Amino acid sequence: MSFTLIGKHEKDSRNNRDGYVTAMLDLMEKDSKVMHVDCDLENCINTGKLAKAFPEQTVNAGIAEANAMGVAAGLAATGRTVFMHSFGCFASRRAFDQAFMS
């Protein structure tokens, strides 16, 4: 079995962190209820741009992913749309225990 792809397929040269920040900037501009909870990664993954553009919609929870999950859950309970961002290895297990308990 064979098939042919139709169209021009080029590799997207943007990296994931820039895509995330661009999407978040767009969402935050369109909806003031969109919140970003950061785990002290503003310089590492370029989310500092979010804090500069929308300081009232950004929370830096520090190096405390479990606490960030609790903050995100609390904000969501008040009607906000929350995106909590951290590295996968730090946002797994213990931090999700916090989300489960919230």
Predicted regions and their residues:
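Thiamine diphosphate
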Residues: 1-102
